[in-house]
């Protein structure tokens, strides 16, 4: 007598990637069910409509594939474990990445636990563009096959024990192939555009949205030479390397080169700007990272040659990583890097393998400044 098929719960977002993931798993012989997560309760009309449309699309796909769709509300977990931390980081003048926190706390913790305990799942699956490889009894996290869509940067906090319970069917495909499959199946999500914006909160006017939760604190904009060139509405609205939205042009005698944010003086509420995107004040020779997560969950000591990304879609930067203590590492780049931003994540790679990463605590500026 053959064993009954393994049960997989697919996180259905109402998008094309999770839709095709569900179908691929059916083809592979799994018993597939879907789960739609509602994680945001602060409903304004616009967001409510978006969530309702996503749920309707997820339901339509599940109906088409003949699978059951469960719904669950993780809004309390999202607020407590993701959103409040997100606001705290902005308040402290740093630029957090909510998608990384959301994957850690919601998709691969709350969802994983709910699927296993309440729905009796053997695995969960998501539409992330990553792959897993099982080596020597541990699961590794690999970049997605489609380099342009690879999302391993957002999943570096996962441990091998979470990866072993997770399946990533579209990680083995290129995005155009995924859309083609959806079109061939006549799925409602086939031509739906990819979502952007904050994880689960969606696409909003960011300044307006943040202003609802954090009071604006206007302050001076000064140049690296100390000249007063304008006023900002709050350091939280600005990030290192930012060019747009500063509201300052070229100076009278000076160059017409665009201005970039090169520093945030949180103590004095001052935004520091300079002209040119490779201004020395914007360049770093390295960084200190904390809150480390290694995929293999082994403590890191000594030094390591690898590559690092300090933001999503960045070209890999060759570097040397040195353990400072259990919680912190120093990263030295082979060449200076622009706009290394505290609060963002530094994610380490060895070839295709995502080793893990940490939060950028501080950047190490170019010594010549």
From Swiss-Prot:
- According to UniProt, residues marked as the site described as Interaction with tRNA are 128, 344
Q: Where is this region: Interaction with tRNA?
A: 149-151, 311-312
One Gene Ontology MF term? ATP binding
Primary localization class, coarse: cytoplasm
Specify whether Zinc is a keyword of the entry: no
* SUPFAM superfamilies registered for this protein in UniProt: Adenine nucleotide alpha hydrolases-like
Q: Which residues form the active site?
A: 102, 199
Where does the UniProt annotation locate this protein? Cytoplasm
Output a single Gene Ontology CC term carried by this record: cytoplasm
Q: Which Gene3D superfamilies match?
A: Adenine nucleotide alpha hydrolases-like domains, HUPs, Translation factors
Q: What NCBIfam families does the database record attribute to this sequence?
A: PRK00143.1 (NF001138), trmU (TIGR00420)
Q: What does this protein do?
A: Catalyzes the 2-thiolation of uridine at the wobble position (U34) of tRNA(Lys), tRNA(Glu) and tRNA(Gln), leading to the formation of s(2)U34, the first step of tRNA-mnm(5)s(2)U34 synthesis. Sulfur is provided by IscS, via a sulfur-relay system. Binds ATP and its substrate tRNAs.
Q: What is this protein called?
A: tRNA-specific 2-thiouridylase MnmA
